[in-house]
């Protein structure tokens, strides 16, 4: 195929030409076909059908599997020799030959490697480049925007070695799995080996995906950008089991394991879920995994939800990789785990193995199955050792914190706003003033799971108050320490996986600080010195300058003076001896090179002769062109107008010997460095604890910086009362250029527990109820709240039902989703819950919506008795104030009405006051919003007329239907019989509305 070029104008010609060349052996099948997942990735993410596979203008698009076309838009395949269309037609008509393709040694090596990595992109080190072949080259060219060309039997693409990390990051962020294939021998070592005339040995050095990459950015200082969310690197493994006895109801048991390798976090969970998979949705919202692992045994409903998550993330520019795994039964999974821990902990003894298995057996069977799948998956990347650090298995749920649902996270805009789905305008954007990346991640976890234990909350608030209003040197010292810390959490994972050490260790080597008044601060600060002796010991072995430059050859201070007779140190003795010998050999070669230089000076009669470097070639001899003493056996390297560059045979021999010693020294130094890191890993748990301490301090200081602002107050807590004076919305007051209108609220378990809030559209109803929930989350996370004063109960949950959206992944309409979410709220609410229901029933007809809203509001007040904020556009619900007198009160958002001439029509204009006022608003004034949006006056006039006529005509009929529907719904919600006499009495006020 080499040297051929095509000008294809018809798809049939392309197919025939491709077929002919396959018969001739000019193109290998591996070069032609893309795997299904790869095609899907290219179609979905690059838009190949529109741009990538087009020939010259006016030509038809051809099969995307054919490698005969331009790979990068607006770039042409390089050709060596052209073939005319006539020659192609003649070739097509001729009988195909049966001659097989002759692969080059490098191509054969690629094919051998590819056998074990069919669904993986291979980046193969060849000299100073990394090359891609066949279908890998095609994908790489599309994703990276590099040229793709034929050479011998395969498509080829390449990138320079010094840019490989940048390109690898782009490939894995595209959702691909990439294997880095490196040369295991250098030219210097190859030239001295018995296999010097054979191909370089190449092996897979590492396999990378988005979730298995240990970020090299740890070695670069990265100041946190306030309010920016870091990309999640969680890998989520899911398994479920449909309960046959409850199959019709859609109930299912779900187990999961979530892994974040960069921070060394492993989370397990098991729960019962419904048809909507609302609990699984909540976990997805918390973890935001970049990789999903599941088997074909997963239920169709769960698969549909995961697919919906993948597509949703894709619309936001994030690619989620899906890995299908083999799911074993729990018995075989336990056997696999027993074998795994036995092999990993063989040196630690049977007790350690028993402890690991005891932890595993305490998990639910589905979580055990997920753990087995997760370990099997990570073995491909040599990262399975994470699970040996069993101290950091964490349950998703905790009795000391609440878990906010997906609806709460999204509806309250905790991490992204609902307009453009960016962090700006979210609660996290307001509160994030952290200094470190790991502190920023911890703050995110704090907001996802506010505390429910009063003592823990008060401890945090005490610490925040002291940090906010204590300007002494101790606080400043802590801030200064945190300010320049790298990402220690990721750095520790790199230590554990033997990727790096010095900067992580030096960051931990800090002085302790004297005690604070806060018990939490004292406890945190006192933990820092506990690790200092370990850190100081390790740091004492390093040459700081060489370690910071990552020079492993000269990194250790005492390796040259290492005495084999001393007691064992933290380095390997045999390797140390080998390193000393190699350094001595290098010194001897360099000394001999100096002697040879003196010989050359004498021979050439040039006493100032020195070795020079030409490019990457060392020890060059430069002589003028007029020199007559050049022996014939000298090797000419290059020349200029005035001089020649040579190597003598002796220089070449010594250079080969020197390069061999230097390469062996690098290899031995790498080995001793990894041996050293394995000793450090024994202290991983202690280092991890200190990282947690520093992250906690960072979060507390972040809260302190917010809490010290004017208008923020420390919340107090009560078992029976919610009383906030001049409550404000933390995000709106920052985003708006107008002064925010504060509001008061007073709820009590012994008195009014429910507010029924009505009012005009855009009047601030939703913002008001959201700001109360946000204040509760801030208070229970340990932060001051935006108010003049705040007295709050400690809520065990904050349940939200607001907004409207369908769920096409499980064929659910907007109204069905609305009802299922309402059912979820009703099933989880307790008397200690804050419940927010916003505009329930708007996904169906008006009368059905009214009836459902009435029944749900009645049920929550009659039986659950939560702290309830019920926002509605149905003023008829105000009759429940009489039914639940002293327990429910009606309020509306204040407004002013005025009559304005609207050209030929008259329309009411509304001015919003954003103030909570007692009573029910008789209308929602939706036409006013239409007026503000610029709807033509003729339409507004007609709509006003129709609205008034409809109200007059259907009022009585609606009342009777409404009563029947409410009675039926209440009977469904309650097992008890309905008191119809009381119900009709309560509803008599309906006639007046």
Swiss-Prot record:
Protein name, as recorded: DNA mismatch repair protein msh3
Function (record text): Component of the post-replicative DNA mismatch repair system (MMR). Heterodimerizes with msh2 to form MutS beta, which binds to DNA mismatches thereby initiating DNA repair. Msh3 provides substrate-binding and substrate specificity to the complex. When bound, the MutS beta heterodimer bends the DNA helix and shields approximately 20 base pairs. Acts mainly to repair insertion-deletion loops (IDLs) from 2 to 13 nucleotides in size, but can also repair base-base and single insertion-deletion mismatches that occur during replication.
GO biological process: gene conversion at mating-type locus; maintenance of DNA repeat elements; mismatch repair; mitotic recombination; reciprocal meiotic recombination
Pfam families, alphabetized: MutS_I (PF01624), MutS_II (PF05188), MutS_III (PF05192), MutS_IV (PF05190), MutS_V (PF00488)
Location of the region described as Mispair-binding domain in the Swiss-Prot/TrEMBL record: 97-211
UniProt GO cellular component terms: nuclear chromosome; nucleus; site of double-strand break
Keyword DNA damage: yes
Organism: Schizosaccharomyces pombe (strain 972 / ATCC 24843)
SUPFAM superfamilies the UniProt entry points to: DNA repair protein MutS, domain I (SSF55271), DNA repair protein MutS, domain III (SSF48334), P-loop containing nucleoside triphosphate hydrolases (SSF52540)
Record keywords, A-Z: ATP-binding, DNA damage, DNA repair, DNA-binding, Nucleotide-binding, Nucleus
Keyword flag Calcium: no
Residues that coordinate or bind ATP: 759-766
Family stated for the protein in its record: Belongs to the DNA mismatch repair MutS family. MSH3 subfamily.
Subunit field text: Heterodimer consisting of msh2-msh3 (MutS beta). Forms a ternary complex with MutL alpha (mlh1-pms1).
Cell compartment(s), UniProt: Nucleus
């Amino acid at each position: 195929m080499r040297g051929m070029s095509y000008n294809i104008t018809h798809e049939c010609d392309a197919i025939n030409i491709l077929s002919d060349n396959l018969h001739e052996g000019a193109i290998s099948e591996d070069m032609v076909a893309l795997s299904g997942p790869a095609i899907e990735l290219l179609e979905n993410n690059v838009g190949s059908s529109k741009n990538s596979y087009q020939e010259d203008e006016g030509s038809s698009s051809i099969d995307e599997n054919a490698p005969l076309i331009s790979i990068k838009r607006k770039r042409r395949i390089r050709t060596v020799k052209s073939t005319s269309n006539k020659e192609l037609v003649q070739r097509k008509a001729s009988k195909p030959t049966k001659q097989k393709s002759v692969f080059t040694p490098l191509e054969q090596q690629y094919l051998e490697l590819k056998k074990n990595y069919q669904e993986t992109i291979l980046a193969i080190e060849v000299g100073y480049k990394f090359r891609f072949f066949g279908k890998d080259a095609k994908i790489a060219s599309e994703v990276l925007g590099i040229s793709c060309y034929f050479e011998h039997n395969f498509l080829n693409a390449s990138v320079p070695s010094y840019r490989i990390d940048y390109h690898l990051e782009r490939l894995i962020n595209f959702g691909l799995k990439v294997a880095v294939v490196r040369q295991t021998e250098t030219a210097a070592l190859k030239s001295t080996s018995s296999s010097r005339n054979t191909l370089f040995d190449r092996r897979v050095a590492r396999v990378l995906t988005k979730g298995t990459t240990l970020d090299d950015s740890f070695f670069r200082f990265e100041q946190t950008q306030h309010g920016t969310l870091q990309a999640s690197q969680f890998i989520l493994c899911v398994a479920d089991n449909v309960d046959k006895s409850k199959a019709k109801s859609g109930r299912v048991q779900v187990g999961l394991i979530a892994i974040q390798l960069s921070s060394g976090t492993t989370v397990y969970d098991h729960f019962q879920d419904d048809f909507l998979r609302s609990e699984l949705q909540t976990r997805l919202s918390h973890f935001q995994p970049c990789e999903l692992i599941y088997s074909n045994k997963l239920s169709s409903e769960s698969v549909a939800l995961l697919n919906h998550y993948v597509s949703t993330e894709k619309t936001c520019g994030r690619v989620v990789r899906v890995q299908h795994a083999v799911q074993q039964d729990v018995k075989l999974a336990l056997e696999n785990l027993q074998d795994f821990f036995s092999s990993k902990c063989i040196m630690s003894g049977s007790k350690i193995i028993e402890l690991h298995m005891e932890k595993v057996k305490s998990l639910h069977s589905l979580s055990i199955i997920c753990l087995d799948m997760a370990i099997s998956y990570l073995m491909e990347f040599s990262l399975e050792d994470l699970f040996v650090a069993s101290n950091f298995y964490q349950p998703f749920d905790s009795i000391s914190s609440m878990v906010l649902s997906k609806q709460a996270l999204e509806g309250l805009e905790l991490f992204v706003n609902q307009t453009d789905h960016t962090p700006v305008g979210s609660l996290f954007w307001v509160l994030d003033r952290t200094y470190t990346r790991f502190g920023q991640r911890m703050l995110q976890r704090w907001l996802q799971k506010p505390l429910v234990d009063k003592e823990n909350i008060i401890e945090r608030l005490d610490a925040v108050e002291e940090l906010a209003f204590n300007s002494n040197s101790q606080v400043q010292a802590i801030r200064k320490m945190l300010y320049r810390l790298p990402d220690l959490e990721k750095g520790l994972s790199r230590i554990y996986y033997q990727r790096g050490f010095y900067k992580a260790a030096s960051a931990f080597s800090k002085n302790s600080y004297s005690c604070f008044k806060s018990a939490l601060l004292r406890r945190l600060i006192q933990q820092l010195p506990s690790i200092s002796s370990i850190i100081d010991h390790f740091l004492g072995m390093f040459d700081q300058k060489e370690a910071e430059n990552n020079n492993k050859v000269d990194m250790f201070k005492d390796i040259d003076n290492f005495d084999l007779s001393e007691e064992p140190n933290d380095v390997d003795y045999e390797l140390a001896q080998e390193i000393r010998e190699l350094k001595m050999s290098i010194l001897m070669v360099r000394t001999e090179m100096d002697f040879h230089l003196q010989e050359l000076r004498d021979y050439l009669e040039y006493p100032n002769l020195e070795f020079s470097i030409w490019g990457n070639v060392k020890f060059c001899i430069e002589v003028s062109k007029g020199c007559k003493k050049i022996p014939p056996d000298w090797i000419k390297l290059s020349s200029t107008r005035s001089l020649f560059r040579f190597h003598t045979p002796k220089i070449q021999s010594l250079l080969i010997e020197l390069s061999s010693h230097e390469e062996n020294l690098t290899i031995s130094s790498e080995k001793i460095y990894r041996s050293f890191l394995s000793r450090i890993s024994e202290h991983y748990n202690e280092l991890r604890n200190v990282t947690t301490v520093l992250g906690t301090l960072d979060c507390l200081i972040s809260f302190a910086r917010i809490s010290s602002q004017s208008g923020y107050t420390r919340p107090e807590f009560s078992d029976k009362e919610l009383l906030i004076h001049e409550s404000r919305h933390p995000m709106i007051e920052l985003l708006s250029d107008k002064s925010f209108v504060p509001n008061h609220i007073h709820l009590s378990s012994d008195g009014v527990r429910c507010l029924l809030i009505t009012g005009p559209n855009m009047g601030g109803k939703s913002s008001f109820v959201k700001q109360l929930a946000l204040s509760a989350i801030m208070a229970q996370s340990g932060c001051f709240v935006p108010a003049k004063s705040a007295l709050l109960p400690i809520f065990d949950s904050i349940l939200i039902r607001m907004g409207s959206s369908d769920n096409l992944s499980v064929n659910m309409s907007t109204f069905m989703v609305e009802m299922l979410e309402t059912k979820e709220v009703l099933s989880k609410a307790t008397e200690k819950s804050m419940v927010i229901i916003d505009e329930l029933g708007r996904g169906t007809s008006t009368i059905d919506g009214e009836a459902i809203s009435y029944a749900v509001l009645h049920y929550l007040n009659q039986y659950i008795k939560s702290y309830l904020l019920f926002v509605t556009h149905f003023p008829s619900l105000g009759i429940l104030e009489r039914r639940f007198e002293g327990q429910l009160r009606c309020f509306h958002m204040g407004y002013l009405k005025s009559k304005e001439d609207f050209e030929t029509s008259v329309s009411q204009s509304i001015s919003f006051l954003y103030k909570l006022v007692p009573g029910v608003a008789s209308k929602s004034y939706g036409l006013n919003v239409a007026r503000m949006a610029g709807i033509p006056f003729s339409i507004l006039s007609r709509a006003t007329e129709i609205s008034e006529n409809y109200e007059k005509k259907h009022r009585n009929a609606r009342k009777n239907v409404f009563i029947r529907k409410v009675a039926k719904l209440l009977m469904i919600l309650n097992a008890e019989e309905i008191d119809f006499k009381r119900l009709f009495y309560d509803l008599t006020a309906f006639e007046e509305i």
